Structures are given as structure tokens and as C-alpha cells.
């Protein structure tokens, strides 16, 4: 402390050039060089000059280290620079060597993936999702046949129900009487018999060679 006080008093007496180069207690390289040259002009001030130079260099080094550590701590790089201790590394970052597990202890076995059917909202395995969706939506060959059969039966049932309803509404008369139906049936039967008789007669004449 005495050396620094003596240095400051000597600087104040030597001139104001060094004070102009000093800004808020922080000395630049040119200011330190200028002050050192002024101190070594006199033989009595050699010790003060050496102390002054050493103190300036020490302050500069300490300030640089302090600023660097402060920057590393604020940015979070101080831990990365220092590293992790061996005890903490073994406990927190232990490598897993078990079968079917990676180095972090996560299972490497392939898990079966499930898919949700958009039609019935059921969970189906991914390998069977396509056939299930085909059957569920009636888009396959067999499913389309079954769906067409169901549609045909529904249409037949609706047609039969509509015909019965029209028959009931008309009071059982569908355009003709029972007598007319009987006459048509008997006339058709007579026509069939006449055609059969004519065929039989023609075959008998051919057998008897009557032309």
C-alpha cells in the first residue's frame, strides 16, 4: 500500500500527462508505459517503478480472470468447462450394459403399434389394420358380396311390404276378379293340351309312314 501511495504521489508531482491517460482507475498499456518511463528517470524511483509495474500487471490479470469467470457463469459454460466429478458421473451417467437395452437403459425391443379404426373406434394391431378396415367398411370381395346380399334382402322386404300395403288398400282387388283369373288359367291349360295332342298325332303318322 505504501508503494502504491508513493507511486501516486510521484505521479502527481511528475506531471499531468499520466493522469490524462488514466480513466476511472483503469490504466491502458500506453498509460502504464508512460508512467513507468517517468518513474525510472530518477534512480530513487526504481523500486517504486517496479512495484507500480507489478501492481498494474497483477490488477490486469486478476480483472481479466474475474471477467472471464463471470461470463462463463452467466452463460452456463462454467460447469461444462470444469466437467463433472467421477463420483457424480458414475452415479448419474452410468452406462447400461443389460440385454435389449441401450446405453441409457431404454428398451430397444420393437413394440407392437396399435391403430384406431375410424369406423368402429377399436384398437387394432397395425399388421391387421388394413383387413379390419376393409371388413369394417364393407370394401372387400366377400364383404361386398355380403353387403349386396343384405341390400337385396332389404329391397325385397321393402318391395313385399309395399305390395301387401297396396293390396290391403285396394281391398284385395288387384285389377281383376277371381273368375277372370280362373278363365285365363283354364284357357292356358287347354292350349297346352291341344299342342301336346297335335304333337302326338304327328308322331303316330310318321311311325305308320303316312305322308
Curated annotation (Swiss-Prot):
Top-rank taxon of the source lineage equals Eukaryota
| Cellular component annotations (GO), alphabetically ordered | cytoplasm; DUBm complex; nuclear pore; nucleoplasm; SAGA complex
Q: Which GO terms describe its molecular function?
A: transcription coactivator activity; zinc ion binding
Q: Where mainly found?
A: nucleus
Regions of biased composition (Low complexity) lie at 157-166, 197-211
ZnF SGF11-type: positions:
115-136
At which residues is Phosphoserine found?
A: 187
What does the entry's domain section say? The long N-terminal helix forms part of the 'assembly lobe' of the SAGA deubiquitination module.
Record note on quaternary structure: Component of some SAGA transcription coactivator-HAT complexes, at least composed of Ada2b, not/nonstop, Pcaf/Gcn5, Sgf11 and Spt3. Within the SAGA complex, Sgf11, e(y)2, and not/nonstop form an additional subcomplex of SAGA called the DUB module (deubiquitination module). Interacts directly with not/nonstop. Interacts with the AMEX complex component xmas-2. Interacts with Cbp80; important for promoter recruitment of Sgf11 that is not associated with the DUB module.
Protein's name according to its UniProt entry: SAGA-associated factor 11 homolog
Q: Which organism is it from?
A: Drosophila mojavensis
- Gene assigned in the entry: Sgf11
Amino acid at each position: 500500500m505504501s508503494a502504491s501511495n508513493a507511486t501516486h504521489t510521484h505521479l502527481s508531482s511528475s506531471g499531468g500527462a499520466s493522469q490524462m491517460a488514466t480513466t476511472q482507475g483503469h490504466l491502458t498499456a500506453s498509460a502504464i508505459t508512460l508512467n513507468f518511463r517517468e518513474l525510472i528517470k530518477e534512480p530513487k524511483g526504481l523500486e517504486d517503478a517496479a512495484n507500480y509495474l507489478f501492481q498494474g500487471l497483477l490488477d490486469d490479470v486478476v480483472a481479466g480472470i474475474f471477467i472471464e469467470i463471470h461470463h462463463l457463469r452467466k452463460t452456463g459454460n462454467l460447469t461444462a468447462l470444469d466437467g463433472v466429478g467421477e463420483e457424480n458421473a458414475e452415479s448419474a451417467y452410468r452406462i447400461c450394459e443389460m440385454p435389449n437395452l441401450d446405453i441409457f437403459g431404454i428398451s430397444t425391443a420393437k413394440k407392437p403399434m396399435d391403430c384406431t379404426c375410424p369406423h368402429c373406434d377399436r384398437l387394432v394391431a397395425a399388421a391387421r389394420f388394413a383387413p379390419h378396415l376393409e371388413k369394417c367398411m364393407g370394401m372387400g370381395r366377400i364383404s361386398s358380396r355380403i353387403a349386396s346380399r343384405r341390400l337385396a334382402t332389404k329391397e325385397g322386404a321393402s318391395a313385399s311390404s309395399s305390395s301387401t300395403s297396396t293390396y290391403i288398400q285396394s281391398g284385395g282387388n288387384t285389377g281383376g276378379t277371381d273368375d277372370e283369373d280362373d278363365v285365363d288359367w283354364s284357357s292356358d291349360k287347354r292350349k297346352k293340351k291341344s299342342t301336346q295332342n297335335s304333337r302326338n298325332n304327328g308322331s303316330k303318322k310318321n311311325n305308320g309312314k303316312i305322308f
